[in-house]
């Protein structure tokens, strides 16, 4: 019998991505629930203020940054702590990454 197992990270860490420092509040709350978990925080300071950038630029940039960070840090989960990133890149990242990707979007 062949069974499929989910991606298991070497350090079982969580990668949190935001365009700036706003996602630090999400990091703080997740850390309260998972105090022994290792976290990586990825902030896109080169294109900060996503509202001033074109969707086409961000649709290319966000997946590139996140994929590179996943390859480098090998997290168990990617959290997009940015509404714009979640709206523009969440479906694509779920397709191309072999780890769960969680986004934040307005209700």
List each model region and its residues.
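Non-catalytic structural scaffold of enzyme domains
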Residues: 2-107
């Amino acid at each position: 019998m062949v069974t499929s197992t989910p991606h298991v990270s070497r350090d079982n860490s969580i990668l949190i991505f935001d365009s700036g420092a706003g996602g630090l509040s999400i990091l703080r709350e997740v850390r309260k629930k998972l105090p022994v978990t290792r976290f990586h925080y990825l902030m896109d300071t080169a294109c900060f203020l996503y509202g001033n950038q074109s969707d086409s630029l961000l649709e290319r940039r966000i997946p590139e940054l996140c994929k590179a960070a996943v390859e480098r840090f090998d997290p168990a989960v990617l959290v997009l702590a940015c509404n714009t990133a979640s709206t523009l890149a969440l479906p694509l990242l779920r397709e191309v990454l072999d780890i769960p990707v969680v986004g934040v979007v307005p209700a």
